[in-house]
């Protein structure tokens, strides 16, 4: 079973949903040109919110826009949606000032049901983690506003999105254990 992003609800669904994401959409004006996908083994993948990354499709998996994929992360793997393939990816990488000399992580596979299960479990605990993180920040008198939490697709790592007027010394904050 293949999955893709269902943008009516913002969730993921089986491939074949007809709704399109207009937000942060990269229009692939070369999509209908034969051989476009073979020109580059790089793909652009979007994660929660506006976070995007570039990955090498070294296994030559047939990918198209909207496919949900498992990609390499440190540690483990993450789940994201393919937003661009083919010749335009290197141009987007250049536009985003992506350092091509750095080691580029790779696409592992199209997401499997077990990947989606772990992803949904991780996504389900994001709100509770955000609330707990806000409580901890308040208890530590950290002048910051935590706006969102994003767990990696396998649940091994979390990204905390916050705003602050000044630099936040978060060393004591990072050593605390949040709910899992």
Predicted feature descriptions by range:
Residues 154-162:
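Short glycine/threonine-rich beta-strand-turn micro-motifs
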Residues 2, 77-139:
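Terminal, basic amphipathic appendages of nucleotide-handling enzymes
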């Amino acid at each position: 079973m293949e999955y893709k992003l269902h943008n009516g609800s913002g969730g993921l669904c089986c491939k074949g949903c007809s709704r399109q994401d207009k937000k942060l959409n990269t229009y692939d004006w070369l999509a209908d040109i034969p051989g476009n996908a073979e020109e580059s083994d790089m793909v652009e993948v979007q994660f929660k919110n506006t976070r995007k990354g570039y990955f090498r499709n070294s296994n030559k998996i047939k990918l198209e826009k909207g496919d949900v994929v498992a990609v390499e992360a440190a540690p483990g793997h993450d789940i994201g949606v393919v937003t661009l393939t083919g010749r335009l990816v290197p141009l987007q990488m250049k536009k985003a000032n992506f350092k091509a000399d750095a080691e580029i992580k790779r696409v592992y596979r199209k997401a499997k049901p077990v990947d989606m299960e772990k992803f949904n479990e991780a996504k389900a605990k994001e709100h509770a983690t955000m609330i707990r993180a806000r409580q901890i920040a308040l208890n530590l008198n950290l002048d910051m506003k935590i706006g969102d939490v994003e767990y990696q697709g396998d649940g091994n790592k979390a990204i905390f999105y916050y705003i602050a007027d000044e630099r936040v010394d978060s060393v004591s904050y990072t050593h605390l254990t949040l709910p899992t």
